[in-house]
Amino acid sequence: MEKLWGGRFQGKSEAWIDDFGASISFDQKMAKEDLAGSLAHVAMLAKCGIISDSEASEITAGLKILQEKLALGELEFSTVNEDIHLNIEKLLHEEIGPVAGKLHTARSRNDQVATDMHLYLKEAVAEIIQSLKHLRAVLVQKAEANVETIMPGYTHLQHAQPISFAHHLLAYFGMFTRDLERLEESVKRIDISPLGSAALAGTTFPIDRAYSAELLGFSAVYENSLDGVSDRDFIIEFLSNSSILMMHLSRFCEELILWTSHEFQFVELTDAFSTGSSIMPQKKNPDMAELIRGKTGRVYGNLFGMLTVLKGLPLAYNKDLQEDKEGMFDTLETVHTSLDIFAGMIETMKVNADIMEESTQKDFSNATELADYLAKKGVPFREAHEIVGKLVLECTQNGIYLQDVAFSHYQEIHPLIEEDIYTVLASKTAVQKRNSYGGTGFDQIHVALANAKKTL
């Protein structure tokens, strides 16, 4: 089959080489965007008098036929035509004849593919933003139901201080809020039209780039044609933002995996988000959480792959840039699906509040409360720290906890300790008293929830 760019060539191509160079197997995902870009381009060509109105009408009609066929799944693509751009041009030629050749006036595949990617990513990121907003709403709802659910707070995966489970959930709400802000802020760098940059240097035709950008819903055009076709930093930024987002999902998934284990039993995932074992009948595995954790590495790989593709490219377009799409497509699908799966897990999981709180009774996470108690009575904190540390050692040797120590022994340890110490050492009291701004105290949690709701 004759190639659309074959005028300069005499030798025949070979199918196996065509297959290696073709991108239609994956860039056909952008068929809708490619057709939209072509419709805007032909309208601009007619407006500027570069093609006649009748030619524009024929081309437009042909493109709309292709849009209808695409919606019905009736378009067939070929590796002989390499990519989505040449495939559509060939299909258009079959629909309307030689006038289809005028569509590519004042346009290169270089600005065409860049335009397609900007359009595709803009719409896909908007969908991810909506999924992320939904997840944030789910977290707020779950936190609101667990303000007074007490759990161990951890450092080094060791019990540190008791906290509200809502406080833990709202910590991730803050992380996902920053993820949302990064994605929303990045849209202005995606929402730029490279169309009209042509191959690299612009065109000799009197085009109106602002008009085609307006038709496509872009907010701006690239100010430099070379920049417009050469860079993929808008994709790298998306991949970077996605990597941070997936990292946050992965951290939470790691905790869910731990919490669902027999050793913790803090939460239970519904059957829909769990799987069994082919040999062990009792198993209920948190596979969806594990998959999100695993897919995080995949998204990281897409980021590093894209950075590596670009790091040595001289301006302007190089065929290496064909490798910019699969990682972007994969990341978009992975992030979107992961967000929806994760939101479903959180929304439906059962919280074992009694087990969580009981866990705080069998540790020394209230040791800081005793040290603070002494400090508030005038004992220098470092001295109080030393006193409590020695008492913890003594308790571990005797197999008891701070709340089990006899009051008479507390007075031997320090005469300023009074009988209210047992109330101070209670987990719920310890949590409630941490009412500094941003703390885990119940009053602060209600403030945080109110603030969070304002941002939903």
From Swiss-Prot:
Biological process terms in GO annotation: arginine biosynthetic process via ornithine; L-arginine biosynthetic process
CDD domains documented for this protein: Argininosuccinate_lyase
GO molecular function: argininosuccinate lyase activity
EC number: 4.3.2.1
InterPro entries according to UniProt: Arg_succ_lyase_C, Argininosuccinate_lyase, Fumarase/histidase_N, Fumarate_lyase_CS, Fumarate_lyase_fam, Fumarate_lyase_N, L-Aspartase-like
A Pfam entry, by short name: Lyase_1
Record-stated family: Belongs to the lyase 1 family. Argininosuccinate lyase subfamily.
Protein name (Swiss-Prot/TrEMBL): Argininosuccinate lyase
